[in-house]
Amino acid sequence: AMGKKAARLGADIRLNTPVTAELIEEIKPHTVFNAIGATPIIPNILGKDQKFVVNSHDVLNGLATPEGNVVVIGGGLVGLEVCEYLAEKGCKVTVLEMMKECGADLGMARKICVQESLYMSGVVQQTEVTVKEIAEGKVIGEKAGETVEYPCDYAVMAIGSKSRDGSMIEAAARKIGAGYIKIGDAGMARRALNAVKEAYDAARTFDDPQIHGYLAKPQKVIAVTGVTGTMGQETLKNLLS
């Protein structure tokens, strides 16, 4: 719906189009919004490259479909979301967390709701576990100085995310004197609530030289990278308004 609305309002939407320095130079935008998001953190664990090891992004996007007995590595917000999702799909889920509790990054009210959901779904939580290796059919860790093993058909990496490298995009924007603004996870991986507010504010103030430090230009040609993502859509919506 957002894409159709943007097209009706005259936005030039280019799908399946990699962002290059040449493309930015061709468009000659007033401002470039970098909304290319984040990529999952993959820790350097022995066995991480095996076929039955997938990451949280691919699971939640439907690109990977674990089944059977699943071990989720990482018991933070994203890891618990993966646990709930897979439990609903009929998987038997065990989550491994290094800290003393799962969901330590959740607010108290939300944590209560999530923990209740995990309990009702039969998700097994194992805390204070440091994962050492992923072997065929099992995840090997260390707990209280002892080796522990968790059998699995699939292992899911859910450690967290890091911003994608946008240095080329920034350099291309600076080269032609365009403004450059990072929004959402492209600036720093964090929660959607904060990132959406940031995208809203950036779209409302992008041509204010006192805020963004470059001179406003009369022609408002804007380039938004990663426009199919949540942050890109929020920015586009407010630019068009």
Segment roles from a protein language model:
Residues A6, L86, L239:
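Short hydrophobic alpha-helical segments of the AMP-binding
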Residues K220-L240:
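N-terminal Rossmann NAD(P)H-binding glycine-rich loop of SDR-like oxidoreductase domains
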Residues V32-A35, S241:
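Short, hydrophobic beta-strand segments that form beta-sheet elements in well-ordered domains
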Residues R14-K28, A35-F52, S56-L106, E142-Y154, ...:
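Rossmann-like dinucleotide/flavin-binding elements
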Residues A1-P29, A104-V129, G137, E149:
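N-terminal Rossmann-like dinucleotide/flavin-binding domain of flavoprotein oxidoreductases
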